[in-house]
Amino acid sequence: MIDKKLLLQDFEMVALSLKKRNNAMDDALERLREVITHYKKQLIELEGLQAFQNKVSKEFGIKMAQKVDTSDLKKELENNKIKLNELSKSVGELEQQIDLRLSIIPNLVDEKTPLGASEEDNIEIKKILTPRNFTFKPKEHFELAQQNGWIDFESGVKLAKSRFSVIRGFGAKIYRALIHLMLDFNEKNGFEIIYTPALVNEKMLFGTGQLPKFKEDVFKIENENLYLIPTAEVTLTNLYNDTIVSVEKLPIKMTAHTPCFRSEAGSAGKDTRGMIRQHQFDKVELVAITHPKESDAMQEHMLESASEILKALELPHRFVQLCSADLGFSASNTIDIEVWLPGQNCYREISSVSNTRDFQARRAKIRFKENQKNQLAHTLNGSSLAVGRTMVALMENHQQADGSIHIPKALEKYL
């Protein structure tokens, strides 16, 4: 959540930053401006009534001590108190309105994030490993998966519906091996392995920014205040919800392997074949809670940690800086890692490492104590990696002319 104090003090600066997102925030901001204007006006009136109440109360006390008639002052105090209570209630309601409207407004755009109108304005930072030159036309992963008997898409539809799949045979062994490899690399880089619930309550989804704005993107358990997690970012970050840690414990670095569940609202017609876009998928996540001065360096560390896995699997990839219009709701700055898919002849996102600054920390009340003072931490999150998409990249990049798949050396010991 944006700092309410900053919003009240410098609305224009906040509005200018949010307009960089290019996602029609004007109406929401204008409504928020109206509420804030009304709130400030009533707050001034309230402060005036409080000052008047204090002044008359002193006069009342003096006259009482002097045993002078105080009936007029008493009546004045009673009338003013009624006004005070009514106005205080109104100010409280307006403050709640501001908080509610703030909860659906995205994070401020970081100064390092380039201005852009769409994903077309994202900027490639660097490429790692050169894509292989094939002597044959490379197949897409769903062809290879079916040929090798690794993924059963029809059974996924039978058991659930479209955008579900069944991984079996040697494909299941590779899938499991990828998870183990990812966790081992992340642990080597200082991230604590944690297993969390796959269900969370509404407060946790509010803390990381999925609710209330993106309710249609998550699966809710009927008649329960529980939701299936869209990412382990939710559980790992919220382990420290409403918590104050000592500055000596920072940074807190965590990794988790979880199933993730997304409704994919608005994705009709996109990636309908294969494993690129599923309702249920596995992901190994990185989350860090840091001192504000250390979050930029942590973002680089998390990117390199994810890249290290792709290099070990001999998968060409690149870093892409997202522009202002392509940022996620909670992110202030995001760098994607895209992996090369020769079957599709393009790079596709496999990780997205975001610095949310203090946006999530303010929503979730994640703080640290330094010099006897409580401060908001910075939180970061990123995939390391999306397991299904890594398997897709492995199949497409390491396919042989006969459709068999070469297994990278780094993965052999896990099989």
Swiss-Prot record:
At the top level of its lineage, which domain of life is listed?
A: Bacteria
Q: What is known of its domains?
A: Consists of two distinct domains, a catalytic core and a N-terminal extension that is involved in tRNA binding.
First and last residue of the signal peptide: none
The organism of origin for this protein: Helicobacter pylori (strain Shi470)
Q: What is the lineage of its organism?
A: Bacteria, Pseudomonadati, Campylobacterota, Epsilonproteobacteria, Campylobacterales
- Its name, as the record gives it, is Serine--tRNA ligase
- Specify which residues bind ATP according to the UniProt entry for this protein: 262-264, 349-352
Main enzyme class: ligase
Instruction: Give the SUPFAM superfamilies listed for this entry.
Output: Class II aaRS and biotin synthetases, tRNA-binding arm
Question: What does it catalyze?
Answer: tRNA(Ser) + L-serine + ATP = L-seryl-tRNA(Ser) + AMP + diphosphate + H(+); tRNA(Sec) + L-serine + ATP = L-seryl-tRNA(Sec) + AMP + diphosphate + H(+)
Tell me its family.
Belongs to the class-II aminoacyl-tRNA synthetase family. Type-1 seryl-tRNA synthetase subfamily.
The yes or no answer to whether the keyword Protein biosynthesis is present is yes
